Amino acid sequence: MAVSRKDWSALSSLARQRTLEDEEEQERERRRRHRNLSSTTDDEAPRLSQNGDRQASASERLPSVEEAEVPKPLPPASKDEDEDIQSILRTRQERRQRRQVVEAAQAPIQERLEAEEGRNSLSPVQATQKPLVSKKELEIPPRRRLSREQRGPWALEEESLVGREPEERKKGVPEKSPVLEKSSMPKKTAPEKSLVSDKTSISEKVLASEKTSLSEKIAVSEKRNSSEKKSVLEKTSVSEKSLAPGMALGSGRRLVSEKASIFEKALASEKSPTADAKPAPKRATASEQPLAQEPPASGGSPATTKEQRGRALPGKNLPSLAKQGASDPPTVASRLPPVTLQVKIPSKEEEADMSSPTQRTYSSSLKRSSPRTISFRMKPKKENSETTLTRSASMKLPDNTVKLGEKLERYHTAIRRSESVKSRGLPCTELFVAPVGVASKRHLFEKELAGQSRAEPASSRKENLRLSGVVTSRLNLWISRTQESGDQDPQEAQKASSATERTQWGQKSDSSLDAEV
């Protein structure tokens, strides 16, 4: 049972630490809100009274925490559980340290912006004193989380820090504010590492109740500040319109009022777009001019300016604020130049229609037509097809077809000649088809005719040399075939036909040479 109680105590301490972290984040947001509100206000007396109340409440609150924590130290948990919880707490502590480093880096920048914005309304001492007091009052409860016995070596450092803080608050020196914040951040992280031993439920409940009371007091003070600022804004709205645009606060409030009127008129103009199409962008350009006249000091932090606008608006009704919040994205679109250009484009087109001399000659139907048809009729030089077609590939097709036709004709003639040679050789084979008995006995009585047939073609060739090449070739073919058909064997006939073909090609070459000479 003891182990289970220790586990439950460890889990409960983790849950409490999570709630404390959430409360710390909420307190940081409240500090930022206080800074933004302090930059816009003109009153100093309520702040001083609120600071006095908070200091008194902090001084009353601190001893009660120590009294609740000191007399009830619990026995420590087992070593394994302590190590597990410490590993979890270390990771969370590293995250806190990172957040605090970021805040420490951003704090002097925000204070500079506040000092620049509040020069007209506040003295720099009070402007820097306000965030200092609020920060350190809100950071006191986590430092007092542990008893002196459990804290050990950090107790002396914390007591010295607490002793220094009220003295520095009384001094209110603005130059030491970033240094104090940076020095208090790392020293705050050291005692939080020993949160494992903080398992007293009574002390945590006291802390939670104190923090709730502190948050309630802060909320009350914020409501007072907002109500006082609303009254100041309503009183000074008339006087600020007459001021020069060099003041950043006056120009920001003027922009809020102008944009509210512009968007209310823009909603009405959307219902009747034909009547109010041109005046709306002119109002948008009028709102652009005070934007350009704003000094760069006001544009240093866009988040703060947006929050100031959001807090300056609650002087009006809540539904109107919701409408303006819904119409915030169109503000960016209305500032852009394309809105004015869309109004000017139709006027330029009408002037061009009136000034162009070519469209005066056309009828009303041609004026209504698209610009492509007008440009096509106005440029007749492009209709000359001779120059364009000579360069195109379509005009070169007839030349290519003629050349191809000649080549095809030559090819067909060569094919015909080869076919004619083959067809002339066919009847010889048909004539020599004979029965086997006749072919075997033919050599007995045809030996004498074979010698005569061999001698006769030579004499006929010599006689035909005098004629033209084509005629001699054909004559030699016919003579040789008629002589060989009745006398020679099929093998001898084939030899004779090959010899005649050779002589034919030789005679053709000789005749071509004679014709050239």
Curated annotation (Swiss-Prot):
One of its GO terms (cellular component) is basement membrane. SEK repeats lie at residues 203-205, 209-211, 215-217, 221-223, 227-229, 239-241, 257-259, 269-271. The keyword Secreted applies. Signal peptide: none annotated. Residues 203-271 are annotated as: 8 X SEK repeats. It comes from the Eukaryota. GO terms for molecular function: cadherin binding; structural molecule activity. Residues 1-401, 481-517 are annotated as: Disordered. This is Ladinin-1. It comes from Homo sapiens (Human).
